[in-house]
């Protein structure tokens, strides 16, 4: 997949460099990035980015390692403060309506808990001092497990699952918080072809049901079959040099 292919995918969408107001009027923006710079210490990974994420997008973020893709997701999720510029939440979107699935870590893979406990942990901090989860939380957890095809695994030990099953459980956990926007960071990394296809179909189904999806991926060709827009960080990373 080259830059020309990506440009064709975005032909009718707003440019990363100069968003066009006439095009944005046809869309409802969920968030707007204006002159956004993100990074760590003295190193800027995202520079002066102007970009809108619109309601209903399936936005695929591509780019080489170190180009700022994960940094951008962390900024949207509220886990990284901009060095300059702003990330504006629009159309009534709040942080607690954003679900975030980071790249899986060794600790996550070996966590000794049941699938149901893992998914319910998305609500920690939302049930105040009660020693149990509310019925609404349990109902939402079961709904998200059904959407990710993990409901039959509810009582299973998480660390005994296959890689694909674990990732679908973590997707269910992220989905519990994702009322309107779902952020996915390399959700199929390390999965076998069958598990990868299953994950993509689940994500596409969530998008078809109205979820706005922003996904970082290296699997560009496959992801673009479903993506409605593409943000190429190989291009953005050059900006400002």
PLM regions with names:
Residues 217-218:
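H-loop/switch region of ABC-family ATPase nucleotide-binding domains
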Residues 85-98:
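Conserved ABC transporter NBD signature motif
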Residues 77:
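Helix-to-loop junction immediately C-terminal to a conserved catalytic motif
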Residues 188-189:
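Short loop immediately C-terminal to the Walker-B catalytic DE motif
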Residues 157-161:
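Conserved ABC ATPase signature
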Residues 182-185:
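Catalytic Walker B motif of ABC-type/P-loop ATPase nucleotide-binding domains
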Residues 135-153:
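Conserved ABC ATPase "signature" region
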């Amino acid at each position: 997949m080259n830059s020309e292919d990506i440009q064709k995918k975005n032909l009718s969408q707003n440019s990363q460099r100069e968003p066009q107001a006439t095009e944005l009027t046809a869309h409802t923006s969920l968030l707007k990035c204006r002159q956004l710079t993100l990074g760590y210490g003295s190193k800027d990974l995202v520079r002066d980015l102007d970009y809108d994420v619109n309601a209903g997008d399936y936005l695929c973020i591509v780019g080489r390692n170190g180009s700022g893709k994960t940094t951008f997701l962390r900024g949207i999720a509220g886990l990284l403060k901009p060095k300059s510029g702003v990330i504006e939440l629009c159309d009534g979107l709040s942080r607690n309506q954003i679900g975030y699935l980071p790249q899986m870590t060794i600790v996550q893979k070996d966590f000794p808990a049941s699938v149901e406990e893992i998914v319910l942990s998305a609500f920690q901090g939302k049930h105040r001092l009660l020693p149990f989860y509310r019925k609404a939380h349990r109902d939402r957890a079961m709904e998200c497990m059904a959407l990710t095809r993990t409901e039959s695994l509810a009582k299973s030990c998480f660390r005994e699952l296959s890689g694909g099953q674990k990732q679908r459980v973590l997707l269910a956990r992220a989905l519990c918080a994702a009322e309107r926007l779902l952020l996915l960071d390399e959700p199929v990394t390390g999965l076998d072809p069958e598990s990868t296809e299953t994950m993509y179909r689940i994500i596409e189904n969530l998008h078809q049901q109205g979820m706005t999806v922003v996904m970082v991926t290296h699997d560009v060709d496959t992801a673009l079959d479903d993506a409605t827009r593409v943000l190429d960080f190989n291009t953005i990373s050059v900006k400002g040099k």
